[in-house]
């Protein structure tokens, strides 16, 4: 997995460049999010636009990132969920925990509204 970092309007964007977020690479995402929030990041967007499959390990990595955000008084949002990934969020009801946006642009705009 390749994780691209960009920044736009004060929002750190992590673009996950992989078709799967699973047990093979979820620790990488978990560690990256932990490092960002420990370093003082307050606004983080994870763009899942290329991810076609997510398992419980991938969901766990994102939940861990969410907890790190809350602990650091920050905010973690998600964007670009493909249908199978969105279905997993709905099945686990994590769509009620995370702020999920269709596009990165909408997610970035949501940070300005708060």
Placement of each model-derived feature along the sequence:
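Short beta-strand/loop segment at the start of cytosolic alpha/beta domains
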Residues: 1-15
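Conserved catalytic submotifs in the C-terminal HATPase_c
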Residues: 17, 49, 105
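Amphipathic alpha-helical interaction surfaces in cytosolic regulatory modules
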Residues: 20-98
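Structural signal for short hydrophobic segments within the conserved structured cores
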Residues: 12-14, 19, 99
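General small-molecule cofactor/ligand-binding pocket signal
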Residues: 4-6, 79, 101
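Residues that form or immediately flank small-molecule/cofactor binding pockets and catalytic motifs
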Residues: 8-10, 83, 105
């Amino acid at each position: 997995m390749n994780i691209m970092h960009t920044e736009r309007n004060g929002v750190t964007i992590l673009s996950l460049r992989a078709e799967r977020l699973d047990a093979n690479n979820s620790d990488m995402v978990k560690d990256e999010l932990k490092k960002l929030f420990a370093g003082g990041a307050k606004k983080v967007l994870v763009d899942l636009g290329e991810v076609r499959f997510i398992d419980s390990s991938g969901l766990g990595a994102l939940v861990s990132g969410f907890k790190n955000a809350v602990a650091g008084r920050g905010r973690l949002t998600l964007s670009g969920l493909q249908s199978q990934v969105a279905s997993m969020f709905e099945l686990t009801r994590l769509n009620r925990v995370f702020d999920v946006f269709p596009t990165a642009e909408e997610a970035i705009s949501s940070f300005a509204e708060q």
